[in-house]
Amino acid sequence: MAGGKRALARLEREMVACLTEACATAQGEIVGFAWLTHQVDLDDFPASLRITWVFTDDTDKARALAGTDKARMIALTAQALSDAGIELDHVAWHVRFDSEEACWRDHGGDWNRRLR
């Protein structure tokens, strides 16, 4: 089991590196996109994997989700995961969208609490 845990931790580090590249790409392409993060329980991987794309405000988030940017973010996520050696049947099930504005409004800016 320890070897399995180490392998999963290594896989997560690779995933973070690939998602960082996806984030940088999106920041140059998608208006209002700020950053992304992920949560995962390695004991329930990959089912527990959740990737959250964060916008500066609700307006930019709504605009992105109404247009082609949503598909672009899902495609960037799928490519990043694939580059890390992670293949999921339904990448979109693991992707969420949020905004800094909503976090401040609903959770006082506490992302740890919001993402639980």
Report each predicted region and the residues it spans.
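Hydrophobic alpha-helical segments that drive targeting, anchoring, or assembly
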Residues: 40-43, 49, 61-63, 94-98
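Intrinsically disordered, low-complexity linkers and terminal regions
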Residues: 8, 13-14, 59, 72, ...
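A short interface-forming secondary-structure element
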Residues: 52-71
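Short secondary-structure junctions
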Residues: 23-35, 84-90
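Polar/charged, Gly/Pro-rich intrinsically disordered segments
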Residues: 87-116
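Charged low-complexity stretches with an acidic bias
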Residues: 67-94
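N-terminal presequence-like segments and adjacent domain-start helices
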Residues: 1-21
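Short edge beta-strands and adjacent turn/loop segments
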Residues: 28-56
